[in-house]
Amino acid sequence: METGRIIKLISGVYQVDVDGTLYDTKPRGLFRKKKFSPIVGDIVDFEIQNTSEGYIHHVHERHNELKRPPVSNIDGLIIVMSAVEPDFSTQLLDRFLVIAHSYDLEPSILVTKKDLASENEIEQINAWLKIYEEIGYNTQFVGKHTSQQEVVATWPKGLIVLSGQSGVGKSTFINAFKPELNLETNHISKSLNRGKHTTRHVELFERESGFIADTPGFSALDFGHIDKDELKHYFIEMNRFGEECKFRNCNHIKEPKCHVKQQLENGYLAQFRYDHYIQLYNEISNRKVRY
């Protein structure tokens, strides 16, 4: 029995990496009976057959799991945004951050295409990134002249997931780091100002200190698993301020003696962050119940 990590899934075949050696495997029938499917990132025990093939017998317990796209055992999540084409959006960034925290992931922020942005755009983005840094996020702002190897060297060891909408430069960034991968890159649809999808499945690529994942681009984010009363925990500065609210179940909207709203009035909480919280809170409150 061998132990390795699933790095790719195509047409029911799971490619497992064991110290650089790849095996094409399939799960045993017992997984179907349990209605459980392995996913990319899983650590598995498998039996080798025919030298390079095998059958998966056991999936180790996952220490975390991203649902969309499905990836497990993530050590770091890099949310990739672009300065332009598509334009940088704090609203979209905050939604990615909420999703990350809801799955107990530690996100960092990477903004690309600095070389394509105007001086005013760069100044505005730097001001926003300063706010995110003060909240506690690691941020990076890079262009085509930035050393990608130096940027990657600052990331956590282990499995790193790159996440973000299409067209922001995820595949381009990986290609620059490891050109032999030659991933297909996105171009921007002029009519929609959005990237056309070229990464259609999750795949892990080996890097010096672990793996890096290129994930399908997101055009919509699903908050179906998040309850409105837990949303406040995923705006981490509000979560800290909320510890001093008079009522433990305070949602920081109309409740009296709310410390979060007091911090907002005093300038210690960014207005745009609070606005995004209220908007998302209302969306979750008004969604239709799923049966």
Curated annotation (Swiss-Prot):
Its cofactor is Zn(2+). Signal peptide: none annotated. It comes from the Bacteria. Zn(2+) binds at residues 245, 250, 252, 258. GTP binds at residues 112-115, 164-172. GO terms for molecular function: GTP binding; GTPase activity; metal ion binding; rRNA binding. Its EC number is 3.6.1.-. Residues 63-221 form the CP-type G domain. GO terms for biological process: ribosomal small subunit biogenesis. It is found in: Cytoplasm. Binds 1 zinc ion per subunit. Keywords: Cytoplasm, GTP-binding, Hydrolase, Metal-binding, Nucleotide-binding, Ribosome biogenesis, RNA-binding, rRNA-binding, Zinc. InterPro entries: G_CP_dom, NA-bd_OB-fold, P-loop_NTPase, Ribosome_biogen_GTPase_RsgA, RsgA_GTPase_dom, RsgA_N. One of its GO terms (cellular component) is cytoplasm. Monomer. Associates with 30S ribosomal subunit, binds 16S rRNA. One of several proteins that assist in the late maturation steps of the functional core of the 30S ribosomal subunit. Helps release RbfA from mature subunits. May play a role in the assembly of ribosomal proteins into the subunit. Circularly permuted GTPase that catalyzes slow GTP hydrolysis, GTPase activity is stimulated by the 30S ribosomal subunit. Belongs to the TRAFAC class YlqF/YawG GTPase family. RsgA subfamily. This is Small ribosomal subunit biogenesis GTPase RsgA. It comes from Staphylococcus haemolyticus (strain JCSC1435). The gene is rsgA.
